[in-house]
């Protein structure tokens, strides 16, 4: 009696574990569906007509395993493109913070910095486009 109780306990744990956890092997996933009654029908109903099922008898009690094609994760969104623009000349009256403020007013989401080329200092802006 104790052996049967232990076996039932182990089988129940296995059923719970396999029904909750999907194991990914390459592009094929496995879903444990419990006992083998109507295994193929339940597999196809849950994961589509291309899924395949089998009854695993390695633990003593036949358990249904459903093999199906895993969904690929969504690709991450592309980073926003950055565009360049200008907001005039940097001077003693309008330096870094002033340039940044001018770019923010001129371009949505814009930021600016003073960029010196030779003897001239231009207010250069970067903004999402």
Swiss-Prot record:
Transmembrane segments: none annotated. It comes from the Eukaryota. One of its GO terms (cellular component) is extracellular region. Coiled coil: none annotated. Disulfide bonds join 29-70, 36-55, 39-64, 43-66, 83-129, 94-114, 99-123, 103-125. It is found in: Secreted. Keywords: Antimicrobial, Disulfide bond, Fungicide, Plant defense, Secreted, Signal. The keyword Disulfide bond applies. GO terms for biological process: defense response; defense response to fungus; killing of cells of another organism. Residues 1-26 form the signal peptide. Its main location: secreted. Confers broad-spectrum resistance to pathogens. Belongs to the DEFL family. This is Defensin-like protein 182. The gene is PDF3.2.
């Amino acid at each position: 009696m104790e052996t049967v109780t232990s076996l039932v306990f182990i089988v129940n744990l296995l059923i719970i574990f396999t029904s909750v956890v999907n194991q990914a092997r390459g592009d094929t996933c496995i879903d444990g569906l419990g006992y083998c009654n109507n295994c193929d029908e339940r597999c196809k109903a849950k994961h589509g007509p291309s899924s395949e099922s089998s009854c695993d008898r390695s633990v003593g009690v036949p358990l249904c395993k459903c093999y199906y094609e895993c969904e690929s994760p969504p690709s991450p969104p592309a980073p926003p493109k950055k565009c360049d623009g200008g907001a005039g000349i940097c001077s003693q009256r309008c330096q870094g913070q002033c340039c940044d403020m001018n770019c923010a007013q001129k371009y949505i989401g814009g930021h600016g910095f003073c960029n010196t080329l030779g003897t001239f200092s231009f207010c250069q802006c970067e903004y999402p486009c």
